[in-house]
Amino acid sequence: MAVTADWSERGEYMLARHSIHPAWANEALDDPDRVVITPDPASKSGRAVRTIGWSYTANRIIAVITLVDNGRLHGVNGWVANSSDQRLYREEDRDE
């Protein structure tokens, strides 16, 4: 089953702010080689999760922030991964 987030509340924001389409973020979430960081180091609540994965459509490594609320996975934000997140992704890929 594919991993997808509900972007109904934050998808337009992410697209406007970071030029990341929700479909690209969902591709990164569903990447079998994704890196999941729980909790996201920047999370103020400690509930957000950072996933670093590959989007085939965007042809980029994308960092995606999600939050589970009432049993549902909500997309919070996403952007092209910075050099640190890209390094984590590539190191995980080599370790396997």
What spans do the regions from the language model cover?
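Ribonuclease/tRNase effector modules and their secretory precursors
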Residues: M1-E96
